[in-house]
Amino acid sequence: MASEKSDLEKAVSTEEAADIGKDGEKPTTVKDIPNVADLTQANMRGLRMPEILARLTPEQRLELETRLRRKIDWRLLPMIILMYILNYIDRNNIAAAKLAGLPEDLNLDPNASEFQTAVSILFVGYLLMQIPSNLFLNKIGKPAIYLPACMMVWGVISAATAAVTNFGGLIAVRFFLGFVEAAYFVTWLLVLLELLVCVMMNTRKELGLRTALLYSGALISGAFSGLISAGITQNMDGARGLGAWQWLFIIEGVITVGVSFFAFWILPNFPRTTSWLSEEEKALAVWRLEEDIGEDDWIDSEHQSLWTGARLAFADVKTWVLLFLLFGIVASGSVTNFFPAVVKTLGYSNVITLLLTCPPYVLTVITTFINAWHADRTGERFWHIMLPLVVAMAAFILAAATTSLAPRYVAMMLMVPGVYCAFVVALAWISNTLPRPPAKRAAALAFINAVSNASSIYASYMYEDRMAPRYVIAMSVNCGTIFLSMVSATVLRFMLVRLNKKLDQGIYVKGAINALPGTAAEHGFRFKV
């Protein structure tokens, strides 16, 4: 044991000797480093280019990167956007169904808040399954099979909503819908992190825009689900003896099931388990990940149990700060679950109301991409979250302060972009802040997303009809949760700035990719602030 320690100290001393003189400071010694064995192991498996890539000329590697980028982009992006459009529509079409007569047909008791309970119960199932689902996928590494299967099941459940005849049936269907849909969002965020980093020119720095691409599915569905719902509501009510709300669930559920069949052979897996990549392309994909974070994630994930990642995530204080940040944003964004009902308070017919829900989402798509693009271009995260939150808070205050039509619709136009612009960049900030190991990253993403969506459980009861048109309680709570996010973002930025200063000095930082002491500055890893 003593000889092993001696050899390790010699290795570190050699590394230190190479680094002394670069900045005039002596790096941290091996005795100052926690978990030295793990650190040395990471360094031993670090930046070593695979032989299959080392023999390529620069021109050949550029050609290989171009081919890899095209393969992944053409297979991945269109399908995940389409899947998320359908995921979001199937989850939130109950808001449009309310305008189409669902509460009346099922004899829901407004005094008992039965409709609100039907909305909130989905997020109970969503919360319970989020972490197990994503840790399971991180272990098996087969999203190309797992996700389409989940999609097929949630499409069937969504279509089955048309058959419910009472409150109990609606509750059961909504619970299981949330249970199955929990697999989707964070899972695809993990796939993005693995696959898109392989093809991006600046890896982690571009994660904000790629996250915006993923989340554009939700925004597009918000923009066009109103149009679809308006068409069904106006033209299919009473067709074949079914109400408009029943056709809404049937049509959208059948489309989801149909798309899931195509997803089975279109979707990719993680880099090492993607069958339609050549051996050279797999090696390059994994190497791009190693270049970005300093080591091979797969080695970590192969040796970690499903719950090891959860333990690591819970032990990191940054996970909890990120949790409060995302919880505040998602809680304020719960207004989108009832957006048709909120817009209905402007006094227009059901069809016009559904059409009026579209412009805020169109604006959201545009502003979210601009904000995410600029966040990636500058490498900055904090202000790209704070400024949209200021806009959202102002919109909520305006909505609660007046009953005038024009100012209230302006508030509705601004509250959705403000929340989503901040949300997309905050999601990217999670992966930027918790880059490794992969099991920890998976657990953190799932845990944060699950708990933050739990806010929708109580938020459902703040948008009852009796609270219209200003929804003062809801708008006030939204302002409070936005303030919570602002404080959390400020605390996180302060923490990351301090950690980056340590990295500048070559000091070991747990969770960062330092290799051996004194080499962090050379490899260039920094937490995004």
Task: Indicate where each model-derived feature is located.
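Helix-breaking motifs and short loop linkers at transmembrane-helix boundaries and internal kinks
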Residues: L106-N107, P132, G141-K142, A163-G169, ...
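Extracytoplasmic gate region of multi-pass secondary transporters
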Residues: A95-A96, T308-W373, L427, S460
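Conserved MFS/SLC helix-loop-helix module at the cytosolic interface between two early adjacent transmembrane helices
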Residues: L128-G169
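Central cavity-lining transmembrane alpha-helices of secondary-active solute carriers
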Residues: V119-L135, C358-I370
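Intracellular terminal tails of multi-pass secondary transporters
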Residues: M1-L86, N92, A100, F264-I299, ...
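Glycine-rich segments within core transmembrane alpha-helices of 12-TM secondary carriers
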Residues: G208-L242, F249-T256, L445-A459
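C-terminal ends and interior cores of transmembrane alpha-helices
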Residues: M152-T165, G178, V390-T403
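Extracellular/periplasmic helix-loop-helix junction of adjacent transmembrane segments
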Residues: A95-L128
